[in-house]
Every structure is written in structure tokens, then in C-alpha cells.
Amino acid sequence: MKQVMVLWLMCLCCMQVKAHSTDDNAFHVGVLLFEGAQAIDFVGPIEVFGQAGFRITTLSKDGEAITTAMGLQVTPHQAFSQELQLDALLIPGGNVNDRLLNDVTVAQWIKAQSKSARYVMSVCNGAFILANTGLLDGLRATTIEKAFNSFEHNYPNVTLARDKKFTDNGKILTTAGLSSGIDGALSLVAKVRGAKVARTVAAKIEYNWQPNGGYIRGKMADRVLPQFDNLPKDVALLSRVFHYGDETTWHKGYTFGIDESKTELLSTWLNQQMTNAGWQKAGAKNALAWSNNVNNTIWLLHVSLKRTSETELTAHLTLTQQI
């Protein structure tokens, strides 16, 4: 019985989780927090940095608690301080609105910290906050896929990397959306403490880290889909049911509000949209199917419509790369 108890206690010791370093000489990462920040954008990297033995300080402009995009309340360690000496600064994404982007105090603090910090890294659409300071001008950057066009439009002096999960400009680093912050954090650990330490951390948190690959949202098949104009006035989008796939196949599902007598209106609109985008009709005459050659690769899009009531129907879009 004593032997069993000893083994049990040993297992408990092995399972203990240590907090981040409190050593003043440890590599020091500051994490910007703001109202509406996306939790995974900073919690994931904090876990990585803590496991790597870094010291971490979370900061908000006034030191007050913030509420994340998912409703989690987080109290930072402190308010902004010009005296704080950081080795790296992490800028997460989330509800990045005009109020935040136009906040002079936030922008000036980031620029001030960037002068002494060895590294500055944005996660997800935190790239907008970083780009707004001018620190990304002339550099390559990435962000969450759904913000690509907006980012490119708003920051023409920044080269957008649509096919990267992580960009490394030496001092300035950016990552794609959400969980990509973990990849960026591991890459920063590799720069500071070496690849072996970074891989050890990845193993400890049971994360399949692929520094030069993995799931890259900007490479997924839906990148070739055209952008549709507004729906006809008698058709209403009720819900987006699903949206998933990989590099060769993509599926989208929608529910539309449309009277049974006007079903043909949606089919006609789809045909017009695809034709305007340069796609060619494929299959039978009445089939909702089109093909297109994109960078010497043939893609086929098929749409199936199914009426669920007199006033609603579902649409399933299937995009496939042809071999």
C-alpha cells in the first residue's frame, strides 16, 4: 500500500504545472490586452512562453480588467508603463475596431516599446494594430484569412503573405488567425532559445508544430471561389450552415428565404454571377455546375438546391480540384 501511495505522489509531482518565470533576468514578454481581445490569440502564446521559461507581463492601457471576444474577464498585471523593459511584445487580435486603431495612447506605447524590444509579434488581425503604427511598412505580413482584402486595401505599404502561417522579418513577426499564434510563439521561442527547446515545448503541450507547413488557411480551396454580389431583392440569406474543406475540396452550406414560385430566380442569379467571374458552364444544360482554370489548375463548382419548406431552401456548394 505504501508503495502504491509513493508512486501516486510521484505521478502528482510529475503532473504539476509551473507558472511562467519570475526571474528578473528571464526573457520578458509583454502581452497587450484590450476590450474584445480574442482569448486564444494571447492565451495560446502565453502557454508556450511560460513553458519556455519566459517571464510574462500582461498589460492594458489603464490596468483595468478586459472582457475578451468570448466573454472571458481577464485582469492584466498592470497598466502601460514607459519604464517597463520588454524583450518582446505580443499584440493579439479580436474586435479590432476604429476606436482601438485610432487610440493614440496605444499606438504610441507600441512604438515606444518597439524601440527597445528585440521582437514585436502580432497574432491574427492584431496585424491591423501593428500596421497602423507604421512598423510594418515595407515588410511582409499576414493576418486572418477573412481580413486579407481589407488589410491589403488599408495598408498598401505592407506586402501581404496570403500563403503563410507566419512571417519573420527579423524583429517584426506576424501570424495568421487564431491558433496560428501558437505557431508564432513557438517560432519566437526557437529564435530566442533554439529549435530544440521550441520542439520540446511543442511536445509538452502536445501540439503538432510544423514550422514550414501545416494548416495554412490562405492555401485552402475556397481561395479560388468568386466573390458574389448582393442577392436578388426577393432572396434573403437566413443562415450560413457550414464552411469547411482543405486544399483541394471545399464545402459551403446556406439557408435562403425564397418563395417556391421564385426558385428559378436564385438559379439565374448564380449563373450570372459565375459567368461574370469567368467560370464556364459544365455538365448538363440545367445543371448548376461551372469550371474554371486557375493558375493551370481546373476547378469544378457544383451547387445543389433543396427546398425545405414553401419559403426556404438550402444550397450546398461543393468545390473540387480536378486531377
Model regions: which residues?
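A conserved active-site-flanking secondary-structure segment within enzyme catalytic domains
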Residues: 136-165, 204
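Residues that mark the start of a beta-strand
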Residues: 26-30, 140, 171
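Extended, subdomain-level signal for the structured scaffold at the beginning of enzyme domains
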Residues: 19-120, 128-133, 162, 186-323
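Bacterial N-terminal signal peptides
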Residues: 4-14
